[in-house]
Design a protein with these regions (language model features):
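Conserved N-terminal segment of class I S-adenosyl-L-methionine
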Residues: 2-235, 256, 271-320
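A conserved beta-strand element that flanks and buttresses the S-adenosyl-L-methionine
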Residues: 241
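Hydrophobic adenine-recognition pocket in adenosine-nucleotide-binding enzymes
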Residues: 245
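A short glycine-rich, Lys/Arg-flanked "PGG" loop and its adjoining helix->strand segment in the class I
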Residues: 254-268
């Protein structure tokens, strides 16, 4: 974890408690964090070290050890990192082991259930939907997914063998930044530069804390004031990652067109597009514009991995190259 900690990096809301009803003004917390200086000192790995870590993790996944070791508390790094964030930044009460983590995750998940339609009428409303205190559950969920290597497909060479050394990579709508996390652990010998971009939500705050001092990373927070121009002057990416994002966007066609325009010719475009019911945090406009968005993508890329033949169904993990 980054060395940046402190309760001043978390702006509390009134009410609740510091255990199973912690209430955070997450946008103000992001703005407070963005004012902090960065001391970029994280060391990057070497190839041989990354090689051994990668193959050990691959073997652990294949043998079914990853999940059991994490769930039983034998693999503890993920839990210690989360606990440091929970205690030293969010000011939560001490977690006594992995059982406390799961008990709390269950409590926050119950609060997070959406039983009524959400208001998507403006950028401000869009952000507020993701910033409700109950959405703290998403940090628990993403931390656990990271620990269990649920996105274990990220360990496969089909992605990283295609990424050039010294690439500039955008992980858009990154949440806890699973692609950067994988790169940091296993592929940092590629010496890439990263831009992690998302709205000021709960998992992205944890991602910033984790990677604040990493020299390979820049953070791009999409507030209401830059909602219509989310990338600013950032351009010339070698890789753009848009995973588990499109179904949540209010303007998926605009965002996709923007991202493709900032991707170099020959660059990699990694994406998927779930066909959801447009409930909860899945945006109704994104469901209505699926075919138009997918047609835009297909018209500008060559699909290297994945299947986009059935536009009426969910589109799974795809790797494409911009034409």
């Amino acid at each position: 974890m980054s060395k940046i900690v402190g309760h001043e990096l978390c702006v509390p809301l009134e009410g609740g408690n510091l255990y199973d009803d912690l209430r955070v003004d997450i946008e103000s917390s992001h703005r407070q964090l963005d004012r902090e200086p960065r001391i970029q000192n994280q060391r990057q790995g070497i190839w041989i070290g990354n090689f051994f870590k990668l193959n050990f993790s691959r073997a652990s996944v294949l043998l079914g050890l990853t999940e059991s070791l994490a769930l039983n508390g034998f693999r503890r790094k993920w839990l210690l990192e989360f606990h440091a964030y929970w205690r030293l930044v969010l000011n939560g009460r001490t977690l006594w082991g992995v059982s406390n983590f799961f008990a709390l995750a269950h409590e926050y998940r119950k609060k997070q259930q959406h039983v009524e339609g959400l208001n998507w009428g403006s950028p401000s409303a869009h952000l507020k939907n993701w910033q409700h205190p109950s959405e703290l559950y998403s940090t628990f969920r993403m931390a656990l997914k990271d620990a269990l290597l649920i996105k274990r497909g990220l360990l496969l060479p089909r992605i990283w063998n295609k990424v050039p050394r010294h690439a500039k990579i955008l992980e858009y709508g990154c949440s806890l930044a699973p692609y950067y996390s994988t790169y940091r652990q296993y592929f940092s010998h590629l010496r890439c530069r990263w831009v992690l971009a998302d709205i000021p939500n709960f998992p992205f705050h944890y991602a910033k804390i984790r990677y604040w001092n990493d020299p390979a990373v820049e953070f791009l927070t999409i507030y209401e004031e830059n909602f219509q121009n989310p990338l600013g002057g950032e351009r010339d990416f070698d890789v753009v990652i848009l995973k588990e994002v499109l179904e949540h966007l209010d303007e998926p066609l605009f965002v996709t067109e923007l991202l493709l325009s900032r991707l170099k010719t020959g660059g990699l475009f990694i994406f998927d597009y779930e066909k959801s019911d447009a409930l909860g945090l899945d945006h109704p406009k994104s469901l209505g514009m699926r075919k138009e968005v997918l047609a835009l993508i297909i018209g500008q890329v060559e699909i290297l991995h994945g299947d986009v033949s059935d536009l009426d169904s969910s589109i799974g993990f795809c790797i494409a190259r911009k034409l």
